[in-house]
Amino acid sequence: MILSIESSCDDTSLAVMEIDSKKLLFHKKISQEIEHSVYGGVVPELASRLHAKALPKILEETKEYFPNLKAVAVTNAPGLSVTLQEGVMMAKALSIALNIPLIGVNHLVGHIYSLFIEKEEIKPMMVLLVSGGHTKILNFNGIESVCEIATTMDDSFGESFDKVAKMLGLGYPGGPVIENLAKKGSDIVPLPLPLRNSPEIAFSYSGIKNAVRLAIESGKYKPEDIAASFQNKAIEHLTFMCKRAIKKHKPENFAIVGGASANLKLREEFEKLSQKFGFKLLYPEMKFTSDNAAMIARAAVEMYKKGMFLNYKDIKIIPRVDFDKCH
């Protein structure tokens, strides 16, 4: 069994998974959304204090598994350094106390493994990762083989939703509130499609965001129409760039992972792409789209099999990570 810890942002989560069967034996998550919503975004110091409070409470519920643990896994990159620290400190303590190896998991790779909870890996696969501050197209061919096809030049998909929600005076996180408001509106606000005439495969959301700001300031449009127009254009930009990547790399399998993969409009548009290009489309179960320790445990199972262990003295917190570019 592996015990995993996730504390990279504003979700505190622990999981226990069987190594051979990949069966999820325990999974619990405490979200901090309510506490941060009053500030319109995540406050790192507050998040850190809330993790420090929640982690021991959840750990208490996992004690029955301690005698059978073969390793402890923890998200150590990327994320907020003060929140990553909370999870890493607990993982180190468990590694020493139980005399078991430590596995440091890249949170973004963890999101890919959210597809495979209680399932076998599917590879090779092209992956659209839309999680928090990240919007990337990746090529996945196993735990040791993830490379980057494209990334964002400025804001991520998720950040742009949060910022537009803030401009409209809506709550945090922006994804669900924009998605719900958009259902009541019409796509009538003219917004630019970024990088339309650029040959590269990349993302950019600053232009759409600025156009939304000008539309709000003009006073001509209802909030629901702005939300609908923004969401449609933001998703169109994703599909436009993914289409370029799909034409170039011709994947048999294509997955969408990360918090924004819960967006139903986004799923709908990629279903259309799947039918057009003939690839198999995958996304995680809804409960595993946002940050969770189950996906960290699932990635750690593959790392355990390959002996990818760290000494408790050597584990480092890495707030930012870059993948190698695909050749």
Curated annotation (Swiss-Prot):
Annotated residues for binding of substrate: L129, V130, S131, G132, G133, D162, G175, N263
Enzyme Commission no: 2.3.1.234
Top-level taxon of the source organism: Bacteria
Keyword annotations: Acyltransferase, Cytoplasm, Iron, Metal-binding, Transferase, tRNA processing
One Pfam family of this chain: TsaD
Catalytic function, reaction form: L-threonylcarbamoyladenylate + adenosine(37) in tRNA = N(6)-L-threonylcarbamoyladenosine(37) in tRNA + AMP + H(+)
Compartment(s) of residence: Cytoplasm
Cofactor note as given: Binds 1 Fe(2+) ion per subunit.
GO annotation, cellular component aspect: cytoplasm
Protein name: tRNA N6-adenosine threonylcarbamoyltransferase
GO biological process: tRNA threonylcarbamoyladenosine modification
Summary of the function given for this chain in its UniProt record: Required for the formation of a threonylcarbamoyl group on adenosine at position 37 (t(6)A37) in tRNAs that read codons beginning with adenine. Is involved in the transfer of the threonylcarbamoyl moiety of threonylcarbamoyl-AMP (TC-AMP) to the N6 group of A37, together with TsaE and TsaB. TsaD likely plays a direct catalytic role in this reaction.
